UniProtKB/Swiss-Prot annotation:
This is Pre T-cell antigen receptor alpha. Glycans are attached at N67, N117. The keyword Disulfide bond applies. Keywords: Cell membrane, Disulfide bond, Glycoprotein, Membrane, Receptor, Signal, Transmembrane, Transmembrane helix. Isoform 1 is expressed at higher levels than isoform 2 in the thymus while only isoform 2 is expressed in polyclonal beta-only cells. Isoform 1 shows a predominant expression in immature thymocytes. It is found in: Membrane; Cell membrane. Component of the pre-T-cell receptor complex (composed of PTCRA, TCRB and the CD3 complex) that plays a crucial role in early T-cell development, particularly alpha-beta T cell differentiation. Isoform 1 acts to retain most TCRB intracellularly, while isoform 2 permits higher levels of cell surface TCRB expression and facilitates signaling from the CD3-TCRB complex. It comes from the Eukaryota. Disulfide bonds join C47-C107. It is a single-pass type I membrane protein. Its main location: membrane. The gene is Ptcra. Pfam families: PTCRA. GO terms for cellular component: plasma membrane.
Length: 199
């Protein structure tokens, strides 16, 4: 589910990414997104690698920071693209308070065991924090209004249904009563004579 969401995000935010040349992996960083995780702001950075190696071949994707350390990232892929090439995806989440310690951020990939590393341009995260897209919870005023209208509509339909049932029942009752008045009264059988015992 997360992978589908990230691929859709990259499709919206990075529509003009160049493809790799002659099967050489091409890493590209998407604009970072600000998330709220456990009450703390985190910066989510996604690296998309076009023309990655197919499954079974070594094609690592990793992030490195300006301080020389490699960062742990979640890597997805490779997945088959509609044009027949393979695509890999890696995501990294960093606390917003620590962004300056990890600048500049670079995404790397290697085509194989003996291949040369391919890297993105360095990404300055602290300047991106003000322009990054935010994914904070927003008030659901419109949703509450829709729920109210839906409840009102359901109540109105219920009242119409109840009125229809009552009218149908009263109409049937009138037919039953009218039918009883039109029928001749039931014939009475003659009762046997009563014998009195005189004492």
């Amino acid at each position: 589910m997360a992978r589908t969401w990230l691929l859709l995000l990259l499709g919206v935010r990075c529509q003009a990414l160049p493809s790799g040349i002659a099967g050489t992996p091409f890493p590209s960083l998407a604009p970072p997104i600000t998330l709220l995780v456990d009450g703390r702001q985190h910066m989510l950075v996604v690296c998309l690698v076009l023309d990655a190696a197919p499954p079974g071949l070594d094609n690592p994707v990793w992030f490195s920071a300006g301080n020389g350390s490699a960062l742990d990232a979640f890597t997805y892929g490779p997945s088959l693209a509609p044009d027949g090439t393979w695509t890999s995806l890696a995501q990294l989440s960093l606390p917003s308070e620590e962004l300056e310690a990890w600048e500049p951020l670079v995404c790397h990939t290697r085509p194989g065991a003996g291949g040369q590393n391919r890297s993105t341009h360095p990404l300055q995260l602290s300047g991106e924090s003000s322009t990054a897209r935010s994914c904070f919870p927003e008030p659901l005023g419109g949703t509450q209004r829709q729920v109210l209208w839906l409840s009102l509509l359901r109540l109105l339909l219920f009242k119409l249904l109840l009125l229809d049932v009552l009218l149908t029942c009263s109409h049937l009752r009138l037919h039953v009563l009218a039918g009883q008045h039109l029928q001749p009264p039931p014939s009475r059988k003659s009762l046997p004579p009563t014998h009195r015992i005189w004492t």
